[in-house]
């Protein structure tokens, strides 16, 4: 709980306005998550985690954020595809249902509140995202967080611009919206440049893979890797073909259209520009030393005693997918 407090305090400082519950968060148990929800300065969202008996939502399904004169509905959804799902559902008497219908209910409720833009903040895999946005055309943007592949550009799925933060919390997915002429139809002005960059990267990787295959065939010690390298080469060529077709079909947007800008930023593990967060972490480590680091004598460090002088951290779950 002490580590959760550090996260909560840091997120409050960052001005976080919504947080979607992920499958690993559920592993903390409902009692802990309810405690976190009470102490957090932002809502914990999930439209599709429900009580098994009543079918009622366990957490809030959406929140309305006001920005630049617009009402933006941010809807949370949690993946229903994870290893210990049955165990979690039994222990807390909950169900994690498919997100399509639960998201539709949140859209209806948000519309009644005057929402104009709809964002899905999804702890979902790509197949779940695709099913959800295709069955809910009102969704215009998806910020995802359980991608297997790293995105190089925003993709249009149905009516929604979809981006992902890849996995393991190592990247921050940042999407900015620019409204022009009061239009809420958005284009990606950087699509052509991003496709060209992706095309060149794939061409370079294909050449490198072909050299690796040729080298492996000549080396008896590496012959066993040839089949794997060849499969990977086929995959790269398929991706290149898809990108080339996207480039051929791309229509450059009008200059006065509303547009998006998206960036995937690697997380900085240092604290040089976040002194207040560093102070919280230092206070936490004074009580709970990092178990992955051992002193020179090889012995694991003992937890320090908690004193009245030690700053008391607040509370929060592991980082998820923030909305900006």
Residue ranges, per PLM feature:
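Acidic, metal/ion-coordinating pockets
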Residues: 1-324
């Amino acid at each position: 709980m002490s580590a959760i407090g550090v996260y909560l305090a840091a997120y409050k400082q960052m001005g976080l306005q919504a947080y979607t519950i992920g499958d690993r968060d559920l592993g903390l148990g409902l009692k802990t998550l309810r405690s976190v929800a009470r102490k957090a300065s932002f809502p914990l969202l999930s439209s599709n985690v429900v009580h098994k008996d009543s079918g009622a939502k366990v957490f809030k399904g959406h929140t309305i954020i006001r920005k630049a004169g617009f009402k933006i509905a941010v809807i949370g959804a949690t993946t229903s595809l994870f290893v210990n799902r049955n165990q979690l559902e039994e222990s807390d008497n909950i169900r994690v249902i498919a997100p399509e219908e639960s998201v539709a209910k949140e859209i209806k409720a948000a519309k009644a509140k005057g929402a104009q833009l709809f964002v899905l903040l999804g702890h979902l895999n790509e197949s779940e995202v695709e099913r959800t946005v295709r069955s809910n055309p009102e969704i215009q943007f998806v910020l995802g967080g359980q991608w297997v592949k790293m995105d190089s550009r925003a993709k249009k799925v149905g009516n929604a611009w979809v981006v992902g933060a890849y996995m393991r919390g190592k990247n921050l997915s940042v999407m900015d919206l620019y409204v022009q002429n009061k239009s809420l139809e958005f284009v990606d002005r950087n699509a052509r440049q991003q496709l060209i960059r992706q095309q060149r990267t794939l061409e370079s990787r294909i050449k490198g893979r072909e050299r690796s295959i040729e080298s492996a065939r000549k080396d008896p010690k590496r012959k066993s890797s040839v089949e794997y390298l060849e499969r990977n080469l086929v995959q790269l060529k398929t991706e290149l073909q898809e990108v080339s077709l996207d480039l051929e079909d791309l229509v450059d947007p009008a200059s006065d259209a509303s547009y998006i800008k998206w960036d995937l930023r690697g997380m900085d593990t240092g604290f040089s520009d976040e002194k207040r967060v560093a102070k919280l972490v230092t206070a936490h480590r004074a009580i709970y030393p990092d178990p992955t680091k051992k002193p020179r004598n090889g012995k694991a460090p003992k937890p320090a005693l908690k004193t009245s002088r030690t700053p008391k951290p607040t509370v929060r779950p592991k980082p998820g997918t923030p909305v900006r």
